[in-house]
């Protein structure tokens, strides 16, 4: 079987320097050139970090930040800021990604102002999923997507909420 699999591109062999022919023996047949040492060491460091911090602790932190954002977005919805939460309103069964829409306001403009005035990066639009947005009735404008990770802080989450409130009230 190995003899039937031919790489599309080839170059230096890594083990037989005087020829450009791909070796027939393993693992050299599929491992020409220099290994991606920065990638290997980066992966090693990331795995050690995950082991030290713990996936459960990462999940708890992301869940806490997302819950804080959801609570405050629901408060803004009730306040009449013309902001609508996309997807589930509760934390149960959802990840650390939250989409909001702003009927009557261009989501691209809101995302631009979040970046320009507050340094908050979001993803805006259809998120490569136009059919999903048609199902959610957010097509063609899309939504503003926030995502929270382990290295975010409560202060950053509250700044995002405050920024949305200020932008939508002006």
Regions found by a protein language model. Give the residues of each.
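Pyridoxal 5′-phosphate
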Residues: 1-170
